């Protein structure tokens, strides 16, 4: 049976944990050695020493490919966590030294990334000009996955985050967004009833987008089958839909953050649908298990407290709280 060492006598080194991970990734001692720029005998010796110290066999060497034993899988699992903490320690020290300098990686779903984030980033940059900001705009699911994988600091999305990803994240309601039906300025349609929607020529995003799914759910609740809508055109971006509507190709449900100013300036005509209101929540999300740099912490605090850098909410967006 393995005898636990004293607290200050760990039975492994970080180099040994790096070697275990490399062998698991590469499937052989030689390739692991190549990836670490050391000799194969040095890798073998470190593994032998680690197995002797732990009193277990970590790798099955009988096949063509080296495989982890059950004990090896346990060691790999905790090795990943230990090495992750080491990386975060380095990040935290660098962040402490840099103070006002840093890098912030944000994620957003399409509507949020196009119409909400530019205003937020501009205000943040005015307060912290030395912090560089990177914005990734993808679907809600992809953004949530990147948060879980530790590739993003903070994200704001409009769609529902899948439960299997949400349980790894801290998710908070940030704002409410409304969708309105719009047509070209000269559109002859006036205040259509719900049943009239079936006869209108629609321009939409693809069915997999969170925007389309939100609209479809609300229409279903009001007795309108989205599959029966006359979808004249499916496009991949909100701006493309706006251009198509302005060209008179049809009508579209669009977020007020995307068209509110355009409606006010007469570039679109808002068509009030009797008895229909489509609202959705915008979600602020981050990974609580990931080290948050000072740049990310300041961004989060500004959004949550409405202080520091956030002076003016994005136009046509109602912040919650």
Regions found by a protein language model. Name each.
Residues 26, 35, 49-57, 127:
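Residue cluster at the C-terminal edge of the helix-turn-helix DNA-binding motif
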Residues 1-11, 221, 256-265, 275-321:
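C-terminal effector-binding regulatory domain of bacterial HTH transcription factors
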Residues 21-39:
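Short helix-boundary/capping micro-motifs
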Residues 141, 168-247, 261-278, 306-321:
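C-terminal regulatory
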Residues 51-73:
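A short LG(V/I)-centered, amphipathic sequence patch enriched
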Residues 101-164, 318-319:
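Central regulatory/effector-binding core of bacterial HTH transcription factors
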Residues 53-54, 75-97, 299, 310-316:
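Alpha-helical linker/hinge and terminal dimerization helices associated
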């Amino acid at each position: 049976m393995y005898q636990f060492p004293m607290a200050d006598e760990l039975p492994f080194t970080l180099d040994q944990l790096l070697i275990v991970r490399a062998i698991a990734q590469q499937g052989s001692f030689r390739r692991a050695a190549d990836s670490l720029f050391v000799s194969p005998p040095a890798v073998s010796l470190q593994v032998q020493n680690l197995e002797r110290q732990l009193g277990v066999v970590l790798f099955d060497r009988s096949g063509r490919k080296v495989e982890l034993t059950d004990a090896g899988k346990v060691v790999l699992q905790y090795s990943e966590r230990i090495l992750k903490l080491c990386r975060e320690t380095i990040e935290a020290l660098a962040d402490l030294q840099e103070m006002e300098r840093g890098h912030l990686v944000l994620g957003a779903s399409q509507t949020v990334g196009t119409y909400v984030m530019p205003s937020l980033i501009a205000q943040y940059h005015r307060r912290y000009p030395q912090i560089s900001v990177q914005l990734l705009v993808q679907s809600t699911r992809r953004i949530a996955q990147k948060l879980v994988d530790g590739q993003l600091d903070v994200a704001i999305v409009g769609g529902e985050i899948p439960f299997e990803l949400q349980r790894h994240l801290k998710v908070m309601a940030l704002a409410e967004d409304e969708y309105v039906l719009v047509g070209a300025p000269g559109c002859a349609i006036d205040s259509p009833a719900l049943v009239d929607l079936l006869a209108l020529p629609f321009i939409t995003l693809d069915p997999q987008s969170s925007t389309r799914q939100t609209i479809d759910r609300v229409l279903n609740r009001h007795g309108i089958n989205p599959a029966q809508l006359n979808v004249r055109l499916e496009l991949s971006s909100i701006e493309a839909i706006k251009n198509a509507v302005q060209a008179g190709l049809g009508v579209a449900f669009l977020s007020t953050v995307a068209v509110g100013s355009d409606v006010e300036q007469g570039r679109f005509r808002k068509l009030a649908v009797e008895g229909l209101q489509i609202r959705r929540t915008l979600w602020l999300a981050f990974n609580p298990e990931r080290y948050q740099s000072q740049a990310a912490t300041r961004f989060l605090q500004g959004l949550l407290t409405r202080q520091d850098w956030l002076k003016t909410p994005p136009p046509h967006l109602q912040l919650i709280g």
